[in-house]
């Protein structure tokens, strides 16, 4: 055997020895979500889980608990145990000990944990909005002062998978101008608003991908169980680099999170499903129901953002998708932030004002989830209509005082008779109702408000929150 052959044999033996050592002394391993700086949901029975050798005993000790928890890894090497968390507070530590290895997790806070998902408007970071030099410098000052030291950020690395994953890539970060700069702007403004109002730690898990449709974030099995949604199962984008196939982001970027106890979720998506407006309520019901089932913590809050005005190439598609999103409010424990007034540039599908978006989402959470009296949490919502001779009376909820209409309102309200021809309408305010009419329509049957792709708000409640676009008819609308 020559010198080169002897060297190769030695290398092989060393590699084999290392592999053998790792196999017989496999260290306890934790998922990415369980690590330094994490926020755990307060007053909850939370999961702590990971991997180890089959049959290996794992001990979990948390500094807020007087007793440890013990669990034995399954034959597949999985382990999971449940521990209880106290009221919000910290910092705490946690130690996970296996046969030959121990992991200490530090700087743990206990508070409120929220999942933040969707497509590009959730995925848009403060850096993507121009960075601190050009966007909300007053917020930068708050961060630099340390106002949000109890907020923690976790970004799920973008990935796709044809099969459900058990782990993702990412880590919990403390707040500074750098970490916030690279975080979802909508998620940040939502979480920082909660932090200010609740005065307790907040953990934000940001998992989003621009240009994606809702079916990509939904388990395929759930779509298969819904006969009306079969269209989405077989849809494929045709691009390996862009996730357009049903379930691939649920598998890689949602399912790995489902062991981690959350309080609820916020969602900013819809643009990529605008031509699916007829099926969108059923699709979102399936997505929300499947997520709630996967987490197994009941019907957790799910608050979402209605898409803003934009000059889509398909006529009325944006208005029809907004209508579909309104219908999603029939899903239990949901709420919707309206953005008809913050579009700015109708040629930009990404409104720059993410501050108000985050705050409006937080108003829903503070009111409905945390029981705080924040005043108004929603703009006017269309409730019912009544034909009264030559006019139509429109009734609203969430008016919070008298309705308000801007001077451009007459251009946003339209009224039609049985011929289905709409004309600009005159509008009068009567408390929580509007009376809509037109001299050109003697026998009105239907009213529409802001029902165009690019319509902006002209109707607000007493506190200045905008109403969603709506219509009283269900006539077929052309999108070509």
Language-model regions, residue ranges each:
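Bacterial Sec-dependent N-terminal signal peptides
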Residues: 1-27
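Cell-envelope and extracellular/periplasmic
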Residues: 26-480
């Amino acid at each position: 055997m020559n010198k080169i052959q002897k060297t190769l044999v030695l290398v092989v033996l060393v590699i084999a020895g290392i592999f053998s050592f790792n196999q017989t002394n496999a260290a306890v391993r934790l998922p990415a979500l369980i690590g330094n700086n994490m926020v755990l949901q307060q007053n909850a029975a939370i999961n702590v889980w990971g991997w180890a050798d089959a049959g290996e005993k794992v001990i979990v000790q948390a500094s807020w608990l007087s007793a440890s928890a013990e669990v034995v890894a399954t034959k597949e090497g999985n382990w999971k145990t449940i521990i209880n968390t106290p009221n919000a507070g910290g910092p705490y530590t946690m130690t996970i000990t296996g046969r030959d290895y121990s992991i200490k997790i530090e700087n743990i806070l206990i508070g409120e944990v929220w999942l933040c998902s969707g497509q590009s408007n959730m995925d848009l970071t403060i850096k993507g909005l121009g960075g601190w030099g050009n966007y909300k410098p007053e917020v930068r000052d708050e961060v630099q002062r340390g106002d949000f030291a109890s907020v923690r950020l976790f970004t799920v690395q973008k990935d796709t998978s044809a099969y459900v994953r058990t782990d993702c890539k990412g880590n919990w970060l403390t707040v500074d101008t750098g970490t916030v700069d690279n975080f979802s702007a909508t998620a940040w403004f939502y979480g920082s608003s909660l932090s200010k109002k609740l005065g307790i730690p907040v953990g934000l898990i940001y998992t989003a991908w621009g240009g994606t449709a809702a079916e990509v974030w939904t388990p395929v099995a759930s779509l298969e169980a819904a006969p009306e949604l079969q269209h989405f199962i077989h849809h494929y984008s045709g691009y390996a680099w862009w996730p357009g196939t049903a379930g691939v982001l649920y598998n890689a970027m949602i399912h790995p999170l489902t062991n981690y106890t959350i309080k609820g979720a916020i969602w900013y998506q819809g643009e990529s499903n605008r031509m699916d407006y007829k099926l969108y309520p059923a699709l979102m019901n399936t997505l929300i129901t499947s997520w709630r089932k996967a987490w197994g913590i009941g019907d957790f809050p799910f608050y979402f953002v209605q898409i803003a005005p934009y000059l889509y190439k398909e006529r009325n598609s944006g208005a029809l998708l907004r209508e579909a999103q309104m219908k999603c409010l029939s899903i239990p424990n949901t709420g919707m932030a309206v953005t008809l007034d913050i579009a700015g540039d109708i040629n930009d599908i990404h409104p720059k004002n993410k501050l108000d978006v985050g705050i409006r989402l937080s108003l829903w959470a503070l009111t409905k989830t945390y029981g705080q009296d924040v005043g108004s949490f929603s703009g006017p919502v269309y409730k019912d209509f009544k034909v009264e001779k030559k006019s139509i009376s429109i009734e609203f909820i969430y008016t919070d005082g008298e309705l308000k209409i801007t001077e451009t309102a007459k251009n946003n309200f339209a009224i039609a008779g049985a011929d289905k021809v709409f004309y600009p309408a005159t509008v009068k305010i009567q408390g929580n109702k509007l009376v809509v009419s037109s001299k050109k329509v003697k026998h009105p049957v239907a009213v529409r408000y802001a029902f165009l792709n690019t319509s902006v708000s002209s109707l607000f409640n007493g506190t200045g929150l905008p109403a969603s676009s709506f219509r009283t008819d269900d006539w077929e609308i052309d999108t070509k």
